[in-house]
Amino acid sequence: AANQHLCGSHLVEALYLVCGERGFFYSPKTXXDVEQPLVNGPLHGEVGELPFQHEEYQXXGIVEQCCENPCSLYQLENYCN
């Protein structure tokens, strides 16, 4: 799919479609959240093995990433829980 601008409800709907039951977030609250996004989640013991690359996408938050600039579905997936 081509990159597209997604704002407001369109952005929420796109995240819901991409992430499904995993849920999603817009931007990290603290640096700790970025490093351990699933600490209390179902994958608690596996977090260290997953290749998280959230920092580069979350530095500015998903609104800047996908509303002010066009973004891809691959980028949206970085905001799934």
Swiss-Prot record:
A single GO cellular-component term on record: extracellular space
SUPFAM superfamilies reported in the protein's UniProt record: Insulin-like
Proregion residues excised on maturation: 33-58
InterPro entries per the UniProt record, alphabetical: Insulin, Insulin-like, Insulin-like_sf, Insulin_CS, Insulin_family
GO biological process: glucose metabolic process
Localization (cell): Secreted
GO terms assigned for molecular function: hormone activity
CDD domains: IlGF_insulin_like
Main location: secreted
Domain of life: Eukaryota
Pfam families: Insulin
Subunit note: Heterodimer of a B chain and an A chain linked by two disulfide bonds.
Protein name (Swiss-Prot/TrEMBL): Insulin
